[in-house]
């Protein structure tokens, strides 16, 4: 489960933008959005498996902001997921600044698609040095390797994160760090290490169904049936139509 942004989607500001967008679509009325708002909406639809809706949000982004790098990168990733590699390369040529951070991640991802992991790793190493081991960069790399199911490389960057960050206090304040590490530990069958981060998140976002579901699954993996049932019951109490519980 990739729930890197799932807690952000609980934010009232995002919900307001989403409601405005969906009202525009339903009522066929024009509205203006910043590029970041529309890209977040596309990310939300992607997380929900609504890929056509995500593409429509990116279509509007590129209509309003035709040179926006993040929107172009999103479109390229969408084409890659559809195995339309040639079309993805054509869109990539529209990006003015290929040294942009997101473009470097895209280059690495395209190399990973071709099993050229060592070349992707070199891009990441240079990027991390350029950005002086910035936490968000390390988290992005961990998430990238987790998504690609590259446990060894993801683990090396988790070690790097722990070596360069205050991991005693940072998880208490950095929601994104908790989500990325949870995703890593859950993906690679280390549920006991994911559970503390899930509990921290649920203390802050007690109505996050995705995190209650994941907590239940982690307890199930450890045969902790009472705790699993309790977590899944919380998810059902929030939404009794929650099919993952």
PLM regions with names:
Residues 64, 94-99, 129-131, 164-170, ...:
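Structural marker of alpha-solenoid helical repeat scaffolds
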């Amino acid at each position: 489960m990739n729930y890197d942004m799932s807690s952000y989607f609980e934010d009232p500001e995002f919900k307001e933008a989403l409601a405005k967008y969906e009202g525009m679509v339903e009522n066929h009325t024009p509205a203006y959005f910043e590029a970041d708002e529309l890209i977040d909406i596309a990310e939300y639809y992607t997380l929900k498996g609504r890929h056509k809706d995500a593409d429509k949000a990116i279509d509007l982004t590129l209509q309003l902001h035709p040179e926006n790098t993040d929107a172009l990168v999103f479109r390229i990733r969408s084409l890659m997921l559809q195995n339309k590699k040639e079309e993805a390369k054509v869109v990539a040529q529209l990006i003015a600044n290929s040294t942009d951070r997101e473009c470097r991640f895209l280059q690495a991802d395209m190399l990973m698609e071709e099993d050229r992991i060592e070349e992707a790793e070199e891009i990441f190493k240079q990027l991390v040095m350029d950005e002086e081991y910035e936490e968000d960069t390390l988290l992005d790399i961990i998430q990238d390797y987790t998504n690609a199911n590259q446990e060894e490389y993801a683990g090396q960057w988790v070690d790097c994160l722990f070596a360069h960050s205050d991991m005693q206090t940072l998880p208490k304040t950095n929601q994104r760090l908790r989500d990325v590490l949870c995703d890593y530990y859950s993906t690679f069958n280390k549920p006991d290490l994911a559970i503390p981060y899930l509990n921290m998140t649920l203390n802050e976002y007690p109505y996050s169904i995705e995190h209650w579901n994941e907590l239940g699954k982690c307890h199930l993996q450890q045969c902790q049936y009472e705790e699993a049932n309790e977590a899944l019951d919380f998810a059902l109490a929030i939404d009794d139509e929650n099919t993952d519980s």
